[in-house]
Amino acid sequence: FSDLTKFIVSEDENVQNSFNSLVKAADKTIESVEVNGSDIAFISYTSGTTGTPKGAIHHHAWGYAHIRTTAKSWLGVRSEDIVWATAAPGWQKWIWSPFLAALGSGATAFVYKGKFEATTYLRLIEKHAINVLCCTPTEYRMMIKCDAFGTFEYPHLRSAVSAGEPLNREVI
């Protein structure tokens, strides 16, 4: 790897390659590429709940239709919202919610890289004023069973949806 160019990007303005200085120096011209509705836009993977995860190919027309229908009608995303879908990139659910629905609606997609821990999730929902939450039913069950559930307040949370497995009536 000795012939590779290596550099470090940092938020620290005092280093040679700070993120902000690289963005400011970058070419502002974007060369667009013509695509058709039938061209492949995404390849993501199903959760594997009912078997081995499967690659799912989606076309540009699907992504557009998703933004136009699901963001508004299923998640209830508004442009001023903070949306947290806990699925990891690469999984089908991540494409649906934080990527297409949130960003395609002009909302903010909240990202948390840590492991699931019920109290941490509840604290983040409160602290970051999450408006739209999409978790797996297992995550919801664990949060509701958490002793700290009632100690947090969720006045901003307007929509909570799930995907990936059945959601039992007790959680709802």
Describe these PLM feature segments:
Residues 11-13, 87, 114-116, 130-172:
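Adenylate-forming
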Residues 40, 46-49, 83, 125, ...:
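Conserved S/T- and glycine-rich ATP-binding loop of Class I adenylate-forming
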Residues 49, 106, 164:
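Conserved G/P- and acidic residue-centered "switch" motifs that form tight phosphate/ATP-binding loops
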Residues 41-68:
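Conserved AMP-binding A3 loop
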Residues 1-5, 107, 155-158:
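A short helix->loop->beta-strand "cap" motif at the edges of active sites that frequently abuts
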Residues 64-85, 89-132, 145-146:
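Conserved AMP-binding/adenylation subdomain of ANL enzymes
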